[in-house]
Amino acid sequence: MLARLVLGTSGRAALGSVEPALGGLKSIWRCSQAFCSTPKGVTYRELKSLLNSKDIMLIDVRNTLEILEQGKIPGSINIPLDEVGEALQMNPVDFKEKYCQVKPSKSDRLVFSCLAGVRSKKAMDTAISLGFNSAQHYAGGWKEWVTYEISEEKQES
């Protein structure tokens, strides 16, 4: 039926040539689904655990003024979104000089955060495109972090 919709009523010869192509498309689709379904977001609890284990580099991509006005997640470093691509391609000496941290390797686990997840997702996509395949983002961002932290402080009181 699909062959007739695509190729008209040309018959079995056309159907024979379409089936291998459809098989190839199905294979590509399965591979893309596996890639796309890889979890790239972290939750508040996962981020807390990762920060406690010191197993990540948390990069806040908000601009410096936002961080000064609102605060930041402890342990994060600030690399504004418009600098992420350039920063991840810097040589290690320049990176250390500018950001006071050792430059991450492509195998290191990076987590990006922002205010509410939009910019951190863009930063993660940039990092992945540069070969940092373990990059993730904290979609809840600073807004969610503050909410959970205040809630935990109240429970401890």
Curated annotation (Swiss-Prot):
Listed name of the protein: Thiosulfate sulfurtransferase/rhodanese-like domain-containing protein 3
Catalytic residues of the enzyme: 114 (cysteine persulfide intermediate)
Pfam families: Rhodanese
List of residues that carry N6-succinyllysine: 96
Domain Rhodanese stretches: 52-154
Disulfide partners: none
GO molecular function: thiosulfate-cyanide sulfurtransferase activity
Organism: Mus musculus
Entry-linked CDD domains: RHOD_HSP67B2
